[in-house]
Amino acid sequence: MNKKNTTFLNSLYMDFLTENELDLFLKSLDEIWTAELYTNLKQNGLIRHVISKVWNKGQHRITQDFEYESQDSFKKCESILK
């Protein structure tokens, strides 16, 4: 297995008004983040994408962390995700 080093990291916080909205978003992830999309992103330098739910009382938040091979890889993937 060829392990790539992360040289560029992008973190995104997403806040929702209610727990139901957050749950609906989480359920829709398979429709948004398809295998084809991940293949395309990986070919352009995405190393890893992690989605985490934040369990703070009174907050409805997720975080998404994107790890890239380089800043250039980030820019390529950003154009794919627009």
Predicted feature locations:
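Short S/T/G/P-rich N-terminal loop/turn motif that feeds into the first structured element of a domain
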Residues: 1-81
